[in-house]
Amino acid sequence: VPFLSYSRYKEALKAECFRHLITARDVLKHEIWNYFNDRYGDIDVLSRNPVIAKGFTRLSGAFHAYGIDGPQFQKIRSIYQPLMEYYVADYGYANIFFIERDGSVIFSALREDFSGTDLFIGEYKDHHIAHIFKLALEDVSFEDYSWNDKVNDFTAYFAAPVFEAESLLGVIVIELPFSHLDTILTHKAGLGKTGEMYLVGEDGLMRSNSRFSVTPTILQKEVDTEATRDAFEGYVGAKIINGFRDMPVLSAYTPLNLNFINWALLVEMDEAEAFVAIQKAESLLKVIASVIGTITIGYIYFTRRAYKKAEEEHDILESEEQSEA
């Protein structure tokens, strides 16, 4: 019965470890959903704002008439600069860009990175911002993270077309720093010394930084495990696998299921740490079993010895009685 009770206790502890990781996974998934859906909402609202459409029209007219360095253009730019700077500061963007439908970058909120260039034929025609611009001419679009020397961070883009009535004016782009997503993912409370949360893109590369690496792992570390393969096939689950550090881990995984992102989310902890309570219980059980075994052997030994002594004494008494007779 005690061993049966321990077996049930062991299974209950394992189930509790997995429940903890699954809860962390589901909470994190919700937070990531909220972050990206909020940014999707931001770009959608900005693109529909009449003030933005008016800004496109006025900036475009001045740009083509006087050039980006002309005082007339700079005067109109100064009207929209404070508003865009507010959006950047308040929402934590890296930048906001206005791009005409012909590919001319006519506004940059914080820096002049691409201003005045042509994203169809200019020096940045193969840049990520050119790619997102071309996609966003049709609909709201997302461009995955890539390294940006200007801000010394990985950045991603959301972009949407801007219309005035039925006429396409161009595309508005918001640039997102990776630091926001990294803050969400580096939450370690309740995950012990070896637990971590991380994202993997469909190209197999991490979209986050591992707590076990002193150098960035985003877009550098390749992860191909049973859990990531399951997640990219659409499965949600939790199991013990061989992790990307080549050791057994408890892994709770899920696809993100965002329309514009095909990533896998994983929450993991080393099996050795997760089952430490079980290991302690097993060690204690071994000690108890050893003590019980020693006591049992001692009991049998002394019982047999006492029984043998009693038999010897009985034989002596019997012999004495026969002699007296």
Predicted regions and their residues:
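Membrane-interface helix-start motif
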Residues: 10-13, 131, 181-185, 269-289
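Short N-terminal helix-loop-first-beta-strand/juxtamembrane motif that initiates sensory/input modules
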Residues: 38-53, 85-105, 140, 186-206, ...
